[in-house]
Amino acid sequence: NINKIKIIDYWRSDEKYYFIDANVKKIFELEEKVETLRCHLQNMPYELGLLPSPVIRSAEELMKKVIEDKISLSRFGDGELEIMQQRERPWFQVADAELSARLKEVFRCKDERIIIALSDNFGNLDRYTEVSADGIRKYLSNGIREKLMEAIDMTQVYYDAYVTRPYLMNKDKRYAQRIFEMFKCLWRDRDILLVEGSKSYIGIRNDLFESARKIRRIIAPCKNAFSVYDKILNSVKQYADENTLVLCSLGPTATVLAYDLAMAGIQTIDIGQLDNEYEWYLRGADEAIEVPGKCVAGLGQHYEVQIIEDEEYKKQIVDSVI
């Protein structure tokens, strides 16, 4: 006894809406356009520089510093900022008081051994694709910007946390090539220790780490890695020294880990979804797509990952903290 005009069927496989009634679809699409324009208008004073936003230096400046000065990188995206306020954002990490406190500690850090990076969402968005810019505007609307700004120090100079997402979001795809080349330069002829989730398979079946001298891996949980944080930290300290470049991809856990290891004298880079971005770059993708055999965080927790049977990958694993 439900009127057909009220029925919307959600199709899980591709997250698109199918409408029983064409009029409902027209209304829905028009409402979406109105909401997009509202968010754009609300955000314009910040995009035009009429209202203040944090100082965030470019990804290229960031890469020059980590290469030349051999300093570490902790990245803060919307997930980390949300967890700092004990609100859950990423599906792969629940918020808790201890993680929130540690993230706040790292975010306030002004130590020269580590760069604190912040997603370049708060000012001009011209470099992003229309889809990406509209997504940022919608996210920052309805009081979210104001909540996030409570944690941001307007006197501090940050760097762009999107350094690890150089491809999909940006209009200029040549930019991605430059950033990927700088990353390859960072680990050229160096021993690297990857700290990654159990379904990540970072660098497997591509040439991202081809320039590295040696690759070792520590495998951690793909969800809620912070629950075994001390074990992960101790494992890294066991296998890394001041000559090792540690690369970690564990969501908010990586943000804290990069800080603790930097304070211990070990250069550590939070590489986030760099491998996914590189895979999309190689494929010429224009949206987030499945990468066979690899976890893609942006596709959600229901995305099925096939196990990669790769002997070289298995040989590189020195510890598993699951």
Describe the role of every protein-language-model region.
Residues G123, C222-N224, D275:
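Residue-level detector of flexible, active-site-proximal loop/helix-junction positions
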Residues D191, T244-L245:
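Structural motif
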Residues D120, I219-P221, G272:
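Residues at the C-termini of beta-strands that transition into short coil/loop
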Residues G197-N243:
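A mid-sequence, solvent-exposed acidic-amphipathic segment
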Residues E196, L245-T253, D270-G272:
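Glycine-rich anion-binding loop/nest that anchors nucleotide
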